């Protein structure tokens, strides 16, 4: 039986179909569900084994990218989301979805009695943020990510770099302190970093533009929680999962790695 995946939709999200297609190719049974159906109890969180928060511009990015969507999760679904994460179910937030995970407090993640502490006020428990790109403009192009040694169930077994598009204006990852950044490294929560001009040698961007497209601290492209089941990243792996006959062998391998990341999340619950 295929694992059921909840692709969460809110006004303004626009990568729902792309994420659903990637999940199908990876062996899951995705369902795109508007958040209002969950509020109305027409759908039940417990019916799903995987959660995807896709990219887009939820609620037109009012009050900041992902902010209102994050407040939806932390205020309407505090218990449901906490239980979903605590159960070890795979969760992935992409671009706007990453912003939602960070601004709700799900990432980097504070826990109490085995449950994640969501940020109902939108700032009190926040250890990190995703803010305006350092270059001050929207970035839309392909980029390279280097998987790191981490706890992340989505990325830890990938062999090779991930090549996929970015499309964001607020992707600069920052922490509230050097200690928080150090803790992320020490606890194995840095899942992906942007690769530099020598990315094939696993050398990060070292802050250099355009390889680090937004000025993120330590070239961070994606982080996970301490348990490793929740991943947030700015680039879009759902947009490079279809292998075409005309592609070169190198391009096919790059596409395979994006799909392998989705398969890792799906296979985790099989």
From Swiss-Prot:
The lineage of its organism: Bacteria, Pseudomonadati, Spirochaetota, Spirochaetia, Spirochaetales. Pathway: Purine metabolism; IMP biosynthesis via de novo pathway; 5-amino-1-(5-phospho-D-ribosyl)imidazole from N(2)-formyl-N(1)-(5-phospho-D-ribosyl)glycinamide: step 1/2. It catalyses: N(2)-formyl-N(1)-(5-phospho-beta-D-ribosyl)glycinamide + L-glutamine + ATP + H2O = 2-formamido-N(1)-(5-O-phospho-beta-D-ribosyl)acetamidine + L-glutamate + ADP + phosphate + H(+); L-glutamine + H2O = L-glutamate + NH4(+). Its main location: cytoplasm. Part of the phosphoribosylformylglycinamidine synthase complex involved in the purines biosynthetic pathway. Catalyzes the ATP-dependent conversion of formylglycinamide ribonucleotide (FGAR) and glutamine to yield formylglycinamidine ribonucleotide (FGAM) and glutamate. The FGAM synthase complex is composed of three subunits. PurQ produces an ammonia molecule by converting glutamine to glutamate. PurL transfers the ammonia molecule to FGAR to form FGAM in an ATP-dependent manner. This is Phosphoribosylformylglycinamidine synthase subunit PurQ. It comes from Treponema denticola (strain ATCC 35405 / DSM 14222 / CIP 103919 / JCM 8153 / KCTC 15104). Keywords: ATP-binding, Cytoplasm, Glutamine amidotransferase, Hydrolase, Ligase, Nucleotide-binding, Purine biosynthesis. GO terms for cellular component: cytoplasm.
